[in-house]
Swiss-Prot record:
Superkingdom per UniProt: Bacteria
Biased composition annotated in UniProt, kind: Basic residues: 898-908
Chain intervals with Low complexity compositional bias: 852-863
Protein name: Protein translocase subunit SecA
Organism classification: Bacteria, Pseudomonadati, Pseudomonadota, Gammaproteobacteria, Vibrionales
Annotated compartments: Cell inner membrane; Cytoplasm
A Pfam family it matches: P-loop_SecA
EC id: 7.4.2.8
Length: 908
């Protein structure tokens, strides 16, 4: 109550921000008469002037009013379009590194030109990031004339560009591209072997379009560059044949019959688990099919791989549905469908063998599993930018997440014209059939009135179901879903025509406005070199149709189901009522809808259904509140998953930074001999400690063992026993110094033979190759650790703390092994000539390019990995060993008596 009273008196935080920004808008507007009087050349010269003023010490904020006024004036001259005051406010919010919530049709693309121009002045590069290649190319081409008029260069960063093209694109002042490409380029750059092969420069300022889609919906999707692991396609096929025999154990089963089911499924958390009875049944089937020995168990260490395949196959059959979660193309390829946008995502694959299991289920060719070579989440990638901002039509519901994870404040920008859309209350039916009948009747009424309708569905399956119902009713319509998005632009262009009916699978993220009366630009594009008269006629005809649609009530939105997220529902509604146009919206629900079925209590469902007749609808405030409560619950759960995923990935991210910084240092240095020398001292000192314990008596020294170790591992043939026999005053410290000194002399002799420059190049190559190999193994080890870490909770330990502790130990081990391996290789390998180094370099370069070509974003499916409230990250196929893993501090199995990490130990 007090908070509401205070807000009334002093305004909300958003109101206060807008008041402050409106004062700056007045400053910008004051420049308008002066700038209108400038010639084109004088206006263009402003860019050079601003850059000179920056060099003299002025800040971007000081330049902002003039810079924004310059862009507005240039836009008037190039496009005949003047930025509204609210767009100026949006531009300032973006420049401040915040999120601007701007309604659909308010001109986000034009708004982004303001901060993009201002932040391009320091010549550090501005990245405008969007969700797909089409939008990146479209926005770049749309805004290119404006930026080039002002003397700025524009680039595009999309998939399948050659490295030289990418490198050139990154030199542009303003670069448009997709989130995937920017992330992959970062990973590829950190797999390069030469500094000149890297394409990116510093990450200075980014404007993320559809920021909620990229920073929230995609936050659980790590970007992974992977290489193929061993082929196990036959195993997937054989195990796939066993799964249909399994039966689900219903939660309603009585205790007496509960043991009869083979697996349990939780629809809320999207998890599936074998029961004890199911485990025994699967083991019997495995034995019959020759996959396991009699008396063996799925959970023995040697069968972990089989268990992995069984779990993947079970999830593929039970949790993932064709035409909802994925489609199968005519070429026999399983393609993921994005649950948020309804788009297909070619090239993306689920990890953990799930994609292969789905391929086996559908009877198509099984692709090889993958091993992670490099990985980063979008959350951690975008936090690398010095300044990050974003735009979307729906951000306010996720404002807390933007603030807590990215430190981004959300500012709701007012519309240029008041919103007049009529949002009608939800209507709820008992069955899905009743609901669809009501939707058909509503559509018929709208078509008769000449009002266009946009019908939003949650899956391809539902869109096709509705399409068939409309065909039976002989209602002409278009379907816009993942299967037909090639025709998307044409369908969207005509979706605002009188009486048009468009079915769309999750319109979120489409990036194209539905214009009432259709798109006159689309008609214009069909003409070759249209005359001025033709253009005027098309515009005049369009105005008549536009006014007719407005009179009919504008675009009518029909929601066929509530989404888990209120934001997606708001995005669907937001397609109507753009720029003050008339419009309406209504959601039709049934008690059979997923959200209501899973999250509405049995008592509530019973109360509603008991009083409903067939075909009867209810509008209930209590039910609406219950639905919103369910949505909030799901949103909160998804936020917790993303937050936990980030907490886990932060551990890997800290290690990633160390490794990538080391790579940068190696690649930018021509001479790393000092680093090698320090490593040699550390490694040899550690080896000597094993055989001559510090401050120990001479009787306790193992001189013979030390001599053998130095000879075998470092090619150092020293007669240490002879030194001691000759000099009885050769004490421990002096002996250490002599060994280290002789090792340095031996290496210098090698340098004299092959030449200093050849050896410097070889040192760099060995260090990079060894680091990359160990980092790849380390990523696999981290994945394995992550998969089982939630089990620590049963031992009364905090899984997150255990993960941090053990991953730190793994990383320390990586650094130790890196030093040892590099020193060992450099000591033992005999380089004859520069050609050998170049050959090694070329081989590694080819491997890196091959790996980069395989780059793919793998879905983390984090909601399926939440075990004991601990979200687990996406991981590639687990590499399983036949024997028990040897601890790094345990005795080495080779029988040397040394610790494993000091003998044959490497990061597993």
């Amino acid at each position: 109550m007090i908070t509401k009273l205070l807000t009334k008196v002093i305004g909300s935080r958003n109101d206060r921000t807008l008041r402050r920004l409106r004062k700056i808008v007045k400053e910008i507007n004051n420049f308008e008469p002066t700038f209108e009087a400038l010639s084109d050349d004088e206006l263009k010269a402003k860019t050079v002037e601003f850059r000179e003023r920056l060099d003299k010490g002025e800040s971007l904020d000081q330049l902002l009013p003039e810079a924004f006024a310059t862009v507005r004036e240039a836009s008037k001259r190039v496009y005949g379009m003047r930025h509204f005051d609210v767009q100026m406010i949006g531009g300032m919010v973006l420049n401040a590194g915040q999120i601007a919530e701007m309604r659909t049709g308010e001109g986000k693309t034009l708004t982004a030109t303001l901060p993009a121009y201002l932040n391009a002045l320091p010549s550090k590069g501005v990245h405008v990031i969007t969700v797909n290649d089409y939008l990146a190319k479209r926005d770049a081409e749309t805004n290119r004339p404006l930026f080039e008029f002002l003397g700025m260069t524009v680039g595009v960063n999309v998939a399948n560009m050659a490295p030289p093209e990418k490198k050139e694109a990154y030199q542009a002042d303003i670069l448009y591209g997709t989130n995937n490409e920017f992330g992959f380029d970062y990973l590829r750059d950190n797999m390069a072997f030469r500094a000149e092969d890297r394409v990116q420069r510093e990450r200075f300022f980014a404007v993320v379009d559809e920021v909620d889609s990229i920073l929230i919906d995609e936050a659980r999707t790590p970007l992974i560059i992977s290489g193929p692991a061993e082929d196990s396609s036959d195993l997937y096929t054989r195990i796939n044949t066993l799964i249909p025999s399994l039966e689900r154990q219903d939660k309603e089963d009585s205790e007496e019959y509960r043991g009869e089911g083979h697996y349990t499924m939780d629809e809320k958390s999207k998890q599936v688990h074998l029961t004890e009875n199911g485990q025994e049944f699967v083991e019997e089937l495995m034995v019959k099919n020759g996959l396991m020995e009699e008396g063996d168990t799925l959970y023995s260490p040697t069968n972990i791989s089989l268990l992995h395949h069984v779990n993947a196959a079970l999830r593929a059959h039970v949790l993932f549905e064709k035409n909802v979660d994925y489609i199968v193309t005519e070429e026999g390829e399983v393609v993921i469908v994005d649950e948020h946008t309804g788009r297909t995502m070619p090239g993306r694959r689920w990890s953990e063998g799930l994609h292969q299991a789905v391929e086996a289920k559908e009877g198509v060719k099984i692709q090889n599993e993958n091993q992670t070579l490099a990985s980063i989440t979008f959350q951690n990638f975008f936090r690398l930018y010095e300044k990050l901002s974003g735009m979307t039509g729906t951000a306010d519901t996720e404002a807390f997440e933007f603030q807590s994870i990215y430190g981004l404040e959300t500012v709701v920008i007012p519309t240029n014209k008041p919103m007049v859309r009529n949002d009608m209350p939800d209507v709820v039916y008992r069955t899905e059939e009743d609901k669809f009948n009501a939707i058909i009747e509503d559509i018929k009424d709208r078509v008769a009135a000449g009002q266009p309708s946009l019908v939003g569905t949650v899956s391809i399956e539902k869109s096709e179901l509705l399409s068939n119902a409309l065909k039976k009713s002989k209602i002409k319509h278009n379907v816009l879903n993942a299967k037909f998005h090639e025709m998307e632009a044409e369908i969207v262009a005509q979706a605002g025509m009188p009486g048009a009916v468009t079915i769309a699978t999750n319109m979120a993220g489409r990036g194209t406005d539905i214009v009432l009366g259709g798109s006159w630009q689309a008609q214009l594009e069909k003409l070759d070199n249209p005359t001025k008269e033709q253009i005027e006629k098309i515009k005049a005809d369009w105005r008549i149709i536009h006014d007719k649609v407005l009179e009919s009530g504008g675009l009518h939105i029909i929601g066929t189901e509530r989404h888990e997220s209120r934001r997606i529902d708001n995005q669907l509604r937001g397609r109507s009522g753009r720029q003050g146009d008339a419009g309406s919206s209504r959601f039709y629900l049934s008690m059979e809808d997923s959200l209501l079925r899973i999250f509405t209590s049995d008592r509530m469902a019973g109360l509603i259904q008991s009083g409903m007749d067939e075909g009867e609808a209810i509008e209930s405030k209590m039910l609406s509140r219950s639905i919103e409560k369910a949505q909030r619950k799901v949103e909160g759960r998804n936020f917790d998953i993303r937050k936990q995923l980030l907490e886990y990935d932060d551990v890997a991210n800290d290690q990633r930074k160390v490794v990538y910084e080391l790579r940068d240092e190696l690649m930018s240095s021509d001479d790393i001999s000092e680093m090698i020398e320090h490593n040699r001292e550390d490694v040899l000192a550690s080896v000597i400690d094993e055989y001559i314990a510090p401050q120990s008596l001479e009787d306790m020294w193992d001189i013979a063992g030390l001599q053998d170790r130095l000879k075998n591992d470092f090619d150092l043939d020293f007669d240490i026993q002879g030194w001691l026999d000759e000099d009885d005053k050769l004490y421990e410290e002096a002996l250490r110094e002599r060994i280290l000194g002789m090792a340095v002399d031996s290496y210098k002799q090698k340098e004299e033979v092959v030449g200093a420059q050849v050896l410097r190049n070889f040192e760099k190559s060995v260090m990079l190759q060894t680091l990359d190999g160990l980092w790849k193994e380390h990523l696999a080890a981290m994945d394995h650790l992550r998969q089982g870490i939630h089990l620590r909770g049963y031992a009364q330990k905090n899984p997150k703390q255990e993960y941090k502790r053990e991953s730190f130990e793994l990383f320390e081990g990586l650094l130790d092994v890196l030093k040892t391996d590099v020193v060992t290789i450099l000591s033992k390998v005999r380089v004859q000539q520069q050609e050998e180094v170049e050959k090694m370099e070329a081989q590694r370069q080819a491997q890196a390019e091959q790996a980069a070509r395989r780059a793919q974003a793998q879905h983390a499916t984090a909601e399926n990995q939440l075990a004991d409230d601990e979200a687990e990250a996406a991981s590639p196929q687990t590499v399983v060993r036949d024997e028990r893993k040897v601890g790094r501090n345990e005795p080495c199995p080779c029988g040397s008596g040394k610790k494993y990490k000091q003998c044959h130990g490497k990061i597993d």
